[in-house]
Regions:
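Beta->alpha turn/N-cap motifs
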Residues: 26, 86, 103-108, 141-142
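Glycine-centered hinge/linker elements that transmit conformational signals in sensory
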Residues: 5-11, 49-83
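Short helix-initiation/N-cap motifs at beta->coil->alpha
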Residues: 3, 81-95
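Short, solvent-exposed loop/beta-turn-alpha elements that line the ligand-binding surface or hinge
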Residues: 39-65, 113-115, 128-136, 189-195
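Paired acidic/hydrophobic, glycine-rich loop segments that form the ligand-binding mouth/hinge
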Residues: 20, 99-104, 122
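Extracytoplasmic/periplasmic solute-binding protein
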Residues: 3-52, 98
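Long, aromatic- and glycine/proline-rich binding clefts that accommodate carbohydrate-like moieties
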Residues: 124-126, 175-205
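Extracytoplasmic/periplasmic substrate-recognition and gating elements
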Residues: 75-76, 113-180
Length: 205
């Protein structure tokens, strides 16, 4: 985020945007900003060493770093308050009002449809808070769960449905329609996947 200040004026004066960045207030974004710093969201190693019992971002300065950079961008006029939710900043971007927005891959198809060729949509990796950060993002969004209800017939039927959902064909279609990553790299060999990448190269990011 700290690098946005360096290009803010250029985007507004030369790029024609009235906002530099439309960034919604959304919990998943906060989680990723913590992860990009390489810091833990919760104690006990993010719950990997033992059961997490409390958040850690208020002690390891992760939250402070996020809010400090965000407040700076807001005070400089580069990141106005656009509302709560993961889609809060998308409308301004799709309308050409803001130069940059933030979203997961699951937002990409909707953005491309909303922009509808009015301007070129570029994609990039999830931003860091500081240039020196060396962390990464965590998974989020749709997950597939099967519960053990002790009924053998239902469990067999559930497993058949799960196999259908995680098949390369289904995952290629799922990726093309939503932007979510396919859970199997075999989906990359499906024509649906290849056609989508050819039409929308932004999905490669």
């Amino acid at each position: 985020l700290e690098g946005i200040s360096k290009i803010g004026d250029q985007l507004m004066n030369q790029g024609g945007a009235s906002e530099v960045m439309s960034l919604g207030i959304y919990g998943w974004f906060f989680e990723q900003f913590v992860g990009k710093q390489g810091l833990d969201y919760a104690n006990n190693g993010n719950g990997r060493d033992d059961v997490a019992t409390a958040v850690d971002f208020d002690k390891n300065e992760a939250a402070k770093n996020i809010l400090t950079e965000w407040q700076t961008l807001n005070q400089e006029g580069y990141a106005p308050i656009v509302g709560k939710g993961g889609d809060a900043g998308l409308a301004d971007f799709s309308a050409g009002k803001s130069a940059i927005t933030l979203g997961s891959t699951a937002s990409l198809k909707q953005i491309l449809q909303d922009v509808n060729g009015k301007f070129e949509v570029g994609t990039a990796y999830f931003p860091k808070i500081k240039e020196s950060d060396e962390g990464g993002v965590s998974i989020g969004g749709a997950s597939l769960w099967a519960l053990n209800n002790q009924d053998p017939k239902k469990l067999r039927a559930t497993w058949e449905f799960v196999k259908f959902l995680i098949s390369p064909e289904s995952q290629a279609y799922w990726n093309a329609q939503t932007g979510y990553f396919p859970v199997t790299t075999a989906a990359h060999e499906e024509q649906t996947f290849k056609d989508n990448i050819a039409q929308y190269p932004q999905f490669q990011t």
